[in-house]
């Protein structure tokens, strides 16, 4: 479904990614793990068109992502839930969800998509008239994910969905990821909580200093001495 080859990217004179090769197959959940500053968020921004790579190729179901304007990438079936959620805090849950249904296909199926989101996240139906900024961190994450799902994506990008949340809420967020997976959606998730994310993905990539250092199934990554020593405290 998603294919990155030899991707270099950065900010000004600073290079953040070096020769990234990454694949996500339809129906998979794939994790990207690594320390702060490794390039994980840059990777997500490159895929969603917020940053243009300096070199390499990105294809989504055969379509060239790099020749697609950023505001049209959602039409390819890619939806991005950014780190820290980026909701409109003074708008209601309903209005935030509407923001995700701006492409024509999503507008045509608005009621159907809204029902899908409310089935996944019943709490959002209860809170639909509440201002998003007054909800708990976990509820805001539900809303941010729901907004992305309103576009009817084929691939959902989740950037640090547990960031800044209390431990109990972190557990709830990963339960949300399991529900999304059960719906059949393909997921690429960036996460620092290595132990938790490896429980919900099929495969994972380890990025350090902008380079992929290791990759494998979740079981292989959990058994990797590199991962255990650096990220699992074993």
Name the predicted role of every residue range.
Residues 12, 30, 68, 93-112, ...:
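ABC-type ATPase nucleotide-binding domains, specifically the catalytic core motifs of the NBD
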Residues 33-35:
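The feature captures the beta-strand-to-loop junction immediately N-terminal to the Walker
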Residues 48:
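Helix-to-loop junction immediately C-terminal to a conserved catalytic motif
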Residues 56-64, 76, 109-114:
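Conserved ABC transporter NBD signature motif
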Residues 148-149:
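ABC ATPase C-loop
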Residues 156-160:
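Catalytic Walker B motif of ABC-type/P-loop ATPase nucleotide-binding domains
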């Amino acid at each position: 479904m998603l294919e990155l080859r030899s991707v270099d990217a950065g900010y000004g004179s600073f290079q953040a990614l070096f020769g990234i090769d990454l694949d996500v197959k339809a129906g998979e959940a794939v994790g990207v793990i690594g320390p702060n500053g490794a390039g994980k968020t840059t990777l997500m921004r490159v895929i969603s068109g917020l940053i243009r790579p300096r070199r390499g190729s990105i294809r989504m179901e055969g379509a060239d992502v790099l020749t697609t304007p950023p505001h049209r990438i959602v039409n390819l079936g890619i939806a991005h839930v950014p780190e820290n959620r980026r909701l409109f805090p003074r708008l209601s849950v309903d209005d935030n969800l509407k923001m995700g249904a701006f492409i024509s296909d999503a507008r045509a199926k608005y009621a159907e998509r809204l029902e899908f989101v409310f089935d996944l996240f019943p709490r959002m139906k209860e809170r639909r008239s509440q201002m998003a900024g007054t909800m708990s961190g976990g509820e805001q994450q539900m809303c941010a994910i729901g907004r992305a799902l309103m576009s009817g994506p084929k691939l959902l990008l989740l950037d640090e969905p547990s960031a800044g949340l209390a431990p109990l809420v972190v557990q709830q967020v990963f339960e949300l990821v399991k529900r999304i997976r059960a719906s059949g959606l393909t997921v690429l998730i960036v996460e620092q909580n290595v132990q938790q994310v490896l429980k919900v993905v099929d495969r994972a990539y380890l990025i350090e200093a902008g380079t992929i250092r290791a990759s494998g199934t979740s079981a292989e990554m959990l058994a990797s001495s590199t991962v255990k020593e650096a990220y699992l405290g074993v």
